[in-house]
Amino acid sequence: MTAATIPGLDNAPTKHQGLLEWVREVAELTQPDRVAWADGSQEEYDRLCAQLVEAGTFKKLNPEKQPNSYLALSDPSDVARVESRTFICSKREIDAGPTNNWMDPAEMRGILTDLYRGCMRGRTLWVVPFCMGPLDADDPKLGVEITDSEYVVVSMRTMTRMGAAALQKMGDDGFFVKALHSIGAPLEPGQKDVPWPCNDTKYITHFPETREIWSYGSGYGGNALLGKKCYSLRIASAMAHDEGWLAEHMLILKLISPENKAYYIAAAFPSACGKTNLAMLQPTIPGWRAETVGDDIAWMRFGKDGRLYATNPEFGFFGVAPGTNWDSNPNAMKTIAAGNTVFTNVALTDDHDVWWEGLEGEPDHLIDWKGQDWILRETETKAAHPNSRYCTPISQCPTLAPEWDDPQGVPISAILFGGRRKTTVPLITEARDWQHGVFIGATLGSEQTAAAEGKVGTVRRDPMAMLPFLGYNVGDYFQHWINIGKQADESQLPKVFFVNWFRRGDDGRFLWPGFGENSRVLKWAIERIEHKADGKSTPIGIVPTAADLDLEGLDVDPADVDEALAVNADEWRAEVPLIEEWFEFVGEKLPTGIKDEFDALKTRLAEDS
């Protein structure tokens, strides 16, 4: 079909010439049966969900257990982000850096243009306008995703400010990020569709200079919901580098003291380190309260007062289900229980509720994430996929801070970096200054937790928890962090801390109880900000003693707390060659400031012997 004969192209609800030309160009290439413009309304959402139920993609859940909620089971080949098929196609290879896959942008465009040719036959091309962050921000970050997946359209309504209001914000000539997505599964006339169409060939490609995202072959999560990691981190980090701000893989937490003073904390953790649990913290210390601003992404820029302010660009939670329960994260469970959730790859109970590993009450029988019968104590495989998800509106979170969508953001008092380390890294360490804090973030690592991820216990470096999400060279990224610190007075900058909830004793048990008790560790950090708490200087930074922490009412062996806080110089000397290996991998763009911090650490460790 020519553009002139594709229904829906000529009655677009916008006069934005650049957008109209792009939609027309994509429609001529991909050959959909029709073009539709998503308006973000409840009516549209309900209609598309009903359509997905009819197609077999969604199962409607028991309205008494999960109101207005649905379960989707993906193709077993399409269950997670695919780092090996994710590309940063900068003009020069050096600008992608050693942590990213790179291909020449012209070559990549050629490959993908061939794949996109006719790829939407038999389907609807959806035009999905959206905004990351509040619509009334001074500089709203707008985007348009073109997709042939209704699953994507309904999920984007939950995860972003999507629809007519975002389109209106673009006006007739406003800038927007072009995000093109196809599942790569055209339908011939009369061909029966499958419940989860996708393609074995997958590309998730970013063009940082032109601020474009091209994704092909996957219908799942971060590969397909292009506002999430693709825009909010990979493209936004390139924007932030050019414009003097930070786009980070961080939760934003509001802590309120007994004196009713609010402190905002941004925290970066690699996967499986409890980011969502901390974002929805329930403090155990009397008088302290916590509220949620965001659980995954923080955009930070300086305010007029010289402080660093953070906004959460997202509109929903896209959380990992397994391990989430009424004990580990009651606030996430309350958010989900309010309804309006799309679950993907969890298990289905006999009464059409959902279940996953770690959830209370193990049923005798389930339909697992592959659609097979699962029988308690007989079936050896997991009922829910380890990366199964819930997609639910942030507005339903009972601990949501009222200012979560303030376009000015919230002023950050502390930045935490944290990993999963059995040894070496203390419960909390305060950086000496901003540059030392950047060094701590640059060397952040987590031990591998399963043999499939690599050798168990091997430390995988994940700088600022951004390893899979950097839109440009990691060395330039470290330098950008250092430069950000030079834009403000040191006294105005957030203090930087390094935390490790996961240290273990010689017998393998956790030394610190974690979860809500982590509020005791955060209290010390706040007292350091207020110059009210002591700490001792060590080769790696300032570390509290057990006496410096508020342990009142905590049933824990004082010797365990001492061990959790210990700085063992021999363990740190063993860490030095691991850091050296990582910095060699970063290569020639490793900033001088980071090298200076590393040299200073080695000197302090030598003096400590």
Swiss-Prot record:
Signal peptide: none
Reported cofactor(s): Mn(2+)
EC number: 4.1.1.32
Binding site for GTP: 272-277, 389, 420, 515-518
Record's subunit section: Monomer.
Binding-site residues for Mn(2+), renumbered to this chain: 229, 249, 296
Function: Catalyzes the conversion of oxaloacetate (OAA) to phosphoenolpyruvate (PEP), the rate-limiting step in the metabolic pathway that produces glucose from lactate and other precursors derived from the citric acid cycle.
Entry keyword annotation includes Repeat: no
GO-annotated cellular components: cytosol
Protein name, UniProt field: Phosphoenolpyruvate carboxykinase [GTP]
Enzyme class of the recorded protein, top EC level: lyase
Highest taxon, organism lineage: Bacteria
Coarse class of the protein's main subcellular location: cytoplasm
Record: active site: 273
HAMAP family: PEPCK_GTP (MF_00452)
Record keyword Cytoplasm present: yes
Similarity field: Belongs to the phosphoenolpyruvate carboxykinase [GTP] family.
Comment on bound cofactor: Binds 1 Mn(2+) ion per subunit.
Any one GO molecular-function label of the UniProt entry: GTP binding
Ligand binding (substrate): 81, 220-222, 271, 387-389
GO biological process: cellular response to glucose stimulus; gluconeogenesis; glycerol biosynthetic process from pyruvate; oxaloacetate metabolic process; propionate catabolic process; response to lipid; response to starvation
Reaction equation(s) it catalyzes: oxaloacetate + GTP = phosphoenolpyruvate + GDP + CO2
